[in-house]
Swiss-Prot record:
Protein name per the record: Integration host factor subunit beta
Lineage of source species: Bacteria, Pseudomonadati, Pseudomonadota, Alphaproteobacteria, Hyphomicrobiales
PROSITE patterns (alphabetical): HISTONE_LIKE (PS00045)
Subunit structure and binding partners: Heterodimer of an alpha and a beta chain.
Gene3D superfamilies, per database record: IHF-like DNA-binding proteins
Keywords, sorted A to Z: DNA recombination, DNA-binding, Transcription, Transcription regulation, Translation regulation
Protein family according to the UniProt entry: Belongs to the bacterial histone-like protein family.
NCBIfam families in the record: hip, PRK00199.1
Keyword tRNA-binding: no
CDD domains: IHF_B
Role description: This protein is one of the two subunits of integration host factor, a specific DNA-binding protein that functions in genetic recombination as well as in transcriptional and translational control.
Gene name of this polypeptide: ihfB
Length: 94
């Protein structure tokens, strides 16, 4: 599902809201999550999961085409851990 499909589904489930308002709400939520991660904060949505950032140390990688060693610098990457309820929901009946 992409963002526009999410907006459409929410708008269909809430006919009293205009689609552009739903889109603004979804964009605002995503912007707040991104801003919190940018600050290094953790964003927890109970029952769904938690977004956080992790630091990856610098390392020596390899160029897959040439096989030559390449220095890969330190970086910060987003991380998502599913909540207990989400894990249970995904694994029910399997």
């Amino acid at each position: 599902m992409i963002k526009s499909e999410l907006v459409q589904k929410i708008a269909e489930a809430n006919p009293h809201l205009y689609q552009r308002d739903v889109e603004n709400i979804v964009n605002a939520i995503l912007e707040q999550v991104a801003s919190a991660l940018e600050r290094g904060d953790r964003v927890e949505l109970r029952g769904f999961g938690a977004f956080s950032v992790k630091k990856r140390d610098a390392r020596v990688g390899r160029n897959p085409r040439t096989g030559k060693q390449v220095d890969v610098s330190e970086k910060t990457v987003p991380y998502f851990k599913t909540g207990k309820e989400m894990r249970e929901r995904l694994n029910t009946g399997k």
